[in-house]
Curated annotation (Swiss-Prot):
GO terms for molecular function: DNA-binding transcription factor activity, RNA polymerase II-specific; RNA polymerase II cis-regulatory region sequence-specific DNA binding; RNA polymerase II transcription regulatory region sequence-specific DNA binding. Interacts with MCM1. GO terms for biological process: cell differentiation; G1/S transition of mitotic cell cycle; negative regulation of transcription by RNA polymerase II; regulation of transcription by RNA polymerase II. It comes from Saccharomyces cerevisiae (strain ATCC 204508 / S288c). PANTHER family: HOMEOBOX DOMAIN-CONTAINING PROTEIN (PTHR24324:SF9), HOMEOBOX PROTEIN HHEX (PTHR24324). The keyword Nucleus applies. Gene3D superfamilies: Homeodomain-like. This is Homeobox protein YHP1. Induction: May be regulated by MCM1. Regulated by SWI4-SWI6 heterodimer. Down-regulated by nonfermentable carbon source.
């Protein structure tokens, strides 16, 4: 197959259209761009040409298009000529376009003095600001705001009994403690000695005298009764401890006395002499009967005997008393607690042989 080498026509021949080339029918469309004397086409600037709607021109002309008369829009020619002159002379001032031109863009210029209508009237809140500050900016603050009342209140000595707190739970309000003076304590103590449980009328009278409320007087009497009860219970426990110690010492002394009855008569006199030396200084008991048998140990000792002769020697009076009990009857001996004297000084030379 043979290959054809097609050669494109020159640019002047295409513009003039005088050459008999095969590309004569396919001439370039008329773009209505002005050219200078040398034939160079000057294009308008991009900023101005961006708003221009360019018509779509088909390169291949149809016979219908050839029959139509060529009409040039004078407005487009005037606009392009003005743009070319402004591009040629940049130092010259641009001419104002006519208001009736369809190619003039309508741009609204916002002056600095007049703010745009889209701006909001309130300030923008920063995200980092606390919530309280944001609420203060967005919500309007009222001058006359209602004051909140809380249960944690304080009173002085002058306003405490007169002005009660204006809250719902006034009875449960936590008040500041006040110290009672010595004069007020004397009045309350005197009333407590007369009657530990005063009635309401008496409490009101005391509250007026002590410059206190009736509730405070009632609480003071309650605390005083509890303190007196606690003091009484502590005294009873200490008395019981002393009594138990006395009973233990009494039992130990009675056991030593009972050992005498089980010893023979030859050694009884020696043990009795030793017992009298170690016995309490107030009194001493000597049992002369050998038939003493204890029944029950405890605080009180009970003895069964046929004939008992008890001799009590009283050291403070210096005389002896003899008590005879009838035969076949029980006699109870009560041993009291005696104070024991501390041991004297011991001579170490007495232990040497």
């Amino acid at each position: 197959m043979e290959s054809r080498n097609t050669v494109l026509p020159s640019l002047p021949n295409i513009i003039t259209g005088t050459s008999n080339s095969p590309f004569q029918l396919h001439t370039l469309p008329n773009t209505n761009f002005p050219s200078d004397d040398q034939g160079d086409i000057r294009l308008p600037p991009l900023a101005a040409s961006a708003h221009i709607v360019r018509p779509v021109v088909n390169i291949y002309k149809s016979p219908c298009d050839e029959e139509r008369p060529k009409r040039k829009s004078p407005q487009a020619v005037d606009f392009l000529s003005q743009r070319v002159t402004t591009s040629m002379t940049p130092l010259s001032k641009p001419k104002k376009l006519s208001s009736h031109s369809p190619f003039t863009p309508t741009v609204r210029v916002c002056s600095k003095e007049q703010p745009p209508q889209s701006m909001h009237s309130y300030k923008k809140v920063n995200i980092l600001t606390p919530l309280s500050a944001a609420k203060a900016v967005l919500t309007p603050t009222t001058r006359k705001e209602k004051k909140r009342s809380f249960a944690f209140i304080t009173h002085s000595q002058e306003t405490f009994p007169k002005k009660e707190p204006k809250i719902d739970n006034a009875r449960l309000a936590r008040r500041k403690r006040r110290r009672t003076s010595s004069y007020e304590l004397g009045i309350l103590q005197t009333a407590f000695d007369e009657c530990p449980t005063p009635n309401k009328a008496k409490r009101i009278e005391l509250s007026e005298q002590c410059n206190m409320s009736e509730k405070s007087v009632q609480i003071w009497f309650q605390n005083k009764r509890q303190a007196a009860k606690k003091h009484k219970n502590s005294g009873n426990t200490s008395h019981c401890k002393v009594h138990s110690n006395d009973s233990m010492s009494m039992i130990s002394y009675s056991d030593a006395a009972l050992e005498i009855t089980s010893t023979p008569t030859s050694t009884k006199e020696a043990i009795t002499a030793e017992l009298l030396k170690t016995s309490p200084a107030n009194t001493s008991s000597i049992f002369e009967d050998h038939h003493i048998t204890p029944c029950k140990p405890g605080g009180q000792l009970k003895f069964h005997r046929k004939s008992v002769l008890v001799k009590r020697t009283l050291s403070n009076t210096g005389h002896s008393e003899i008590i005879k009990s009838p035969k076949g009857k029980e006699n109870r001996l009560k041993f009291n607690a005696y104070e024991r004297k501390p041991l004297g000084e011991v001579d170490l030379n007495s232990f040497k042989n």
